[in-house]
Amino acid sequence: MDLKFKVHFALVLLFLAHFGESQTGVFDITKYGANSNADISEALLNAFKEACQSTSPSTIVIPKGTFTMNQVKLEGPCKSPLELQIQATLKAPSDPSQLKVGEWLTVNKLDQFTMSGGGILDGQAAAAWECKQSKKCNKLPNNLSFNSLTNSTIKDITTLDSKSFHVNVNQCKNLTFIRFNVSAPANSPNTDGIHVSRSSSVNITDSNFSTGDDCISVGDETEQLYITRVTCGPGHGISVGSLGGNPDEKPVVGVFVRNCTFTNTDNGVRIKTWPASHPGVVNDVHFEDIIVQNVSNPVVIDQVYCPFNKCNKDLPSQVKISKVSFQNIKGTSRTQDAVSLLRSKGVPCEGIEVGDIDITYSGKEGPAKSSCENIKPSLKGKQNPPVCTASAASSS
């Protein structure tokens, strides 16, 4: 092998090595100037800009450590699948005045996006919650916002102490959350775990929620939402709604909550609509194989939802609820009201089914009871307490 050929061969190997390295598509933000003593926002944006242009799958790595990060928006479309691997603890500015109205970390318009890594997004919200309680601050940012994602996965991520919602999901399709964790104190205001709206085929599975508001809340135009093997508590339970508060809300169709456990929550499984509401539709909603442990209001349909008592309760909700089932719900209630089904006088409920309910209450007031208004569900199996019958302890 002559010298010229050896040199040529060596150059080819160097090219292939460089090409192979680029094809692995790993973009470590520390290579873009990120360090633990400064805001990593610019480094993350620069890494994303390059990764987004890659024609082969790429991974942005935020390595282990603790970093500060201001508001960041990662916006596609990108040329190939992209993974954001958060191994670190990311801390938001604690002073709410340092943040503009919007979200802390936003991911928009991506296909085949993955967020992973076992990291923590810490909203550092104590000062913001105090500000919110005093009503002296602007709208506070959510920790995470996912908009117009398709065929994407969020896994092994924790969101901690968000200033508002932990996660907002909007206009997404085929999005999965797995081993996703939400953590905030029970008294943290408006800290819904995941809020889903205008999205279809969203899966939330094997995940844990401890927060100050709904663990999972469902907004309008949600279709085919699957919630499986989720733990909730503290928090306000899993809620479809509140609905009917805005004009032109689209139907909620296909919500399936299965094999979930609620512990020390203010509610269990719930559908809630405003009185004097705009028209709306809730259809094909099923709560099955649910365990409640010391839960206030374990089973609820509330069409007179008015948390701040600033509603016209004389006018009925115009949200039509149909094809809803509560099946195999067992455990203990913190209040005597184990089952509460309050239907609107304005539009009839249809196809409401209650089966195999066994919820006990051990307070001095007496055993658990149900309350029913303007509703006559189909009953299957056993119900303890009796539901919507003459033998119910409280029924109207």
Curated annotation (Swiss-Prot):
SUPFAM superfamilies per UniProt: Pectin lyase-like
Keywords of the record: Cell wall, Cell wall biogenesis/degradation, Disulfide bond, Glycoprotein, Glycosidase, Hydrolase, Repeat, Secreted, Signal
UniProt-listed PROSITE patterns: POLYGALACTURONASE (PS00502)
UniProt main location, coarse: secreted
Catalysis performed (reactions): (1,4-alpha-D-galacturonosyl)n+m + H2O = (1,4-alpha-D-galacturonosyl)n + (1,4-alpha-D-galacturonosyl)m
Active-site residue list: D213, H236
Glycan attachment residues as annotated in the record: N143, N151, N174, N181, N203, N208, N259, N294
KW Protein biosynthesis (keyword) present: no
Localization per Swiss-Prot or TrEMBL: Secreted; Secreted, Cell wall
S-S bonds: C215-C232, C372-C388
PANTHER family per record: PTHR31375
Protein name per Swiss-Prot or TrEMBL: Polygalacturonase
Organism: Nicotiana tabacum
Gene name as annotated: PG1
